[in-house]
Design a protein with these regions (language model features):
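A broad "non-catalytic interaction surface" signal
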Residues: 1-137
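Append "Rare intracellular matches occur via the same short Y/T/C beta-strand/loop motifs
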Residues: 29-32, 142-144, 161-171
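Extracellular/surface recognition and adhesion modules
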Residues: 49, 94, 133, 146, ...
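Histidine/glycine-enriched, metal-chelating micro-motifs
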Residues: 54, 172-173
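Surface-exposed, flexible coil segments in extracellular/virion-facing regions
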Residues: 60, 140-158
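Solvent-exposed segments in extracellular or luminal domains encompassing
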Residues: 68-82, 153-170
């Protein structure tokens, strides 16, 4: 996903229409170019992924990385897709904050900043953005049924006739 956002502290943005596919057990990187809310204020943030697709970011391992406090820069956050058995579309949340003497550790997945110029309204101001990833299984489990009643994924030593195969995946499709 490559998305150059507005660069302003606009609270929450829903970019879940932007997605990429990932496969369990594989490693990936998220490269985040964190801007600021003006005047080169130091910012930091966190990245969360809803691995079990339960609609929140509160489960162990769903906080996948920290964007260290600093002036605008790019941070690479590596992650490995866990073998969770949850497949399909889920959310990636990036929370960035102007850290007015606040530690990055205090940033939570449900934080949505508030900004009013020229006064900062607590708890902070920044941006929260949601994206999507589609989690795919590392292996595709399937059942095979050939017209000669074989049940393996391939057959050999065949007569010259037409063969058909019905393949059913782990979802019964």
């Amino acid at each position: 996903i490559n998305n150059n956002t507005t660069g302003v502290c606009d609270q929450y943005e829903d970019y879940t229409n932007l997605f990429t596919d990932v496969t369990e057990g594989q490693s990936y990187n998220i490269d985040i170019s964190l801007g600021d809310c003006s005047n080169n204020y130091p910012s930091g943030g966190k990245v969360f992924i809803d691995w079990n697709i339960d609609g929140d970011f509160n489960d162990p391992g769903e906080e996948v990385g920290t964007i260290p406090i600093g002036l605008p820069s790019t941070t690479t956050i590596p992650f490995t897709v866990p073998f969770s058995g949850a497949y399909g579309a889920t959310r990636v949340r990036i929370v960035s904050q102007f850290l007015n003497n606040t530690l990055v550790g205090s940033i939570g997945p449900c934080d949505i900043g508030v900004m009013a110029n020229p006064i900062y309204i607590q708890p902070w101001y920044g941006a929260t953005e949601d994206y999507s990833i589609v989690i795919n299984s590392a292996t595709v489990s399937a059942n095979y049924l050939w017209s000669n009643f074989a049940t393996t994924d391939s057959i050999s030593n065949l007569s010259i006739v037409t063969y058909t195969v019905d393949i059913t995946d782990q979802n019964g499709c």
